[in-house]
């Protein structure tokens, strides 16, 4: 691998990750606060909720995180391989990332901190889906066969679709993914456990789709880093994104678009939008180098895991801090606006925490660079860092 590829930076990947995180942790709460304060039109609020069937803006958040995980994997792991073979550093990195994301997922949503076997859910969070997709993609990355790499996502996608089509139906408790979920849970958690309350979401069998989505991101990175010129790279990405989107729309004629179980019609549409969104940002920021005014979003992209944990595990603490800081604001903006005001302050609190985290990270990098005689590479003037260090996905 050339030195150029080793130091390649993808500003657009951090930007897309940041936009996804800002939507989840800042924009969503702001919209709900505005709705609580003044009431927003139902069509607007429908875009910020998960329905059983259909596709909303809110539905794209989780698939996009999994997609970006796969996109970042080659950037993080290829430098831990030697002549295409994994080193000890490769396996340590994969094991650490998988374990970290899995445990943090159980902290965020699996209630592991209760230490109550009747409360704990072993597998029910976005971070764990990222870990699952990460492991599948990392292992497939070891193959030297391009045919296997191309066939794997197709087989995962088709296999999952066939299973759901041939067994069960597409109702909340009658689909095959749900039946498989219950069968697995009965064998690993106590009877009567809260883990059985899945709210229609499925995880174990649906891991096939998490692998598919991660591999979609992996192949997009392969296209971007290929020897093709920019025009052909763009054409390939647009063809892939448009093809996936069209496939999703076509499948929707027979297969319901259902996010909680990631039906093939939903997943193909989600991946189509992810590929197209990244293509646009790649052209704007990595090709045309238009990057001004994006520092806050990039901050969220580079420290997405910190922002995510603030939004989930430490959500009560963030909200309480916002309440303390905003307690006098009703005198200025009125009581009616307080839900929206609290959401604004909570967003500022999360942004402040992420900024502090970035300063700590940059200081650590600077000290390491000084310890290495100033040879350690730092941040560029445009604020971009290599995409792979983001804890949430690589």
How should each PLM-predicted stretch be described?
Residues 383-389:
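Short, low-complexity intrinsically disordered segments enriched in A/P/G/S/L with frequent Arg
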Residues 1-367, 393-394:
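Alpha-helical transmembrane segments and their immediate juxtamembrane cytosolic regions
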Residues 372, 379-382, 393:
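Acidic/polar hotspots within intrinsically disordered regions
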């Amino acid at each position: 691998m050339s030195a150029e590829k080793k130091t390649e930076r993808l500003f657009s990947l951090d930007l897309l990750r940041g936009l996804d995180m800002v939507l989840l942790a800042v924009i969503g709460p702001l919209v709900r606060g505005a709705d609580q304060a003044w009431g927003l039109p139902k069509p607007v609020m429908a875009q910020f909720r998960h329905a059983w069937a259909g596709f909303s803006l809110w539905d794209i958040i989780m698939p996009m995180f999994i997609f970006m995980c796969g996109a970042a994997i080659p950037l993080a792991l290829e430098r831990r391989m030697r002549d295409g073979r994994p080193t000890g550093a490769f396996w340590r990195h994969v094991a650490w990332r998988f374990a970290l994301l899995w445990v943090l997922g159980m902290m965020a949503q699996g209630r592991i901190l209760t230490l109550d076997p009747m409360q704990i859910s072993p597998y029910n969070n976005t971070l764990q889906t990222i870990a699952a997709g990460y492991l599948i993609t990392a292992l497939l990355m070891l193959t030297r066969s391009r045919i296997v790499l191309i066939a794997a996502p197709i087989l995962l996608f088709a296999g999952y679709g066939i299973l759901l089509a041939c067994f069960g139906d597409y109702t909340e408790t009658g689909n095959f993914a749900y039946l498989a979920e219950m069968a697995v849970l009965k064998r690993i958690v106590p009877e009567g456990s809260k883990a059985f309350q899945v709210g229609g979401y499925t995880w174990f069998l649906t891991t096939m789709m998490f692998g598919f989505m991660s591999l979609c991101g992996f192949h997009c990175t392969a296209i971007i880093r290929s020897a093709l010129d920019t025009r052909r790279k763009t054409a390939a990405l647009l063809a892939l994104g448009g093809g996936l989107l069209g496939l999703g729309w076509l499948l929707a004629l027979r297969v319901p678009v259902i996010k909680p179980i990631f039906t093939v019609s939903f997943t193909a549409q989600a991946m189509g939008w992810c590929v197209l969104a990244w293509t646009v940002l790649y052209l704007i920021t990595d090709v045309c180098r238009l990057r001004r005014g994006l520092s806050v979003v990039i901050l969220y992209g580079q420290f997405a895991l910190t922002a995510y944990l603030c939004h989930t595990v430490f959500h009560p603490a963030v909200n309480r801090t916002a309440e303390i800081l905003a307690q006098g604001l009703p005198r200025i903006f009125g009581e009616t606006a307080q839900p929206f005001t609290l959401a604004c302050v909570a967003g500022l609190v999360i942004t402040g925490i992420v900024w502090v985290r970035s300063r700590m990270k940059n200081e650590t990098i600077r000290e390491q660079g000084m310890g290495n005689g100033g040879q350690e590479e730092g941040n560029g003037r445009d604020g971009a860092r290599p995409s792979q260090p983001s804890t949430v996905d690589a």
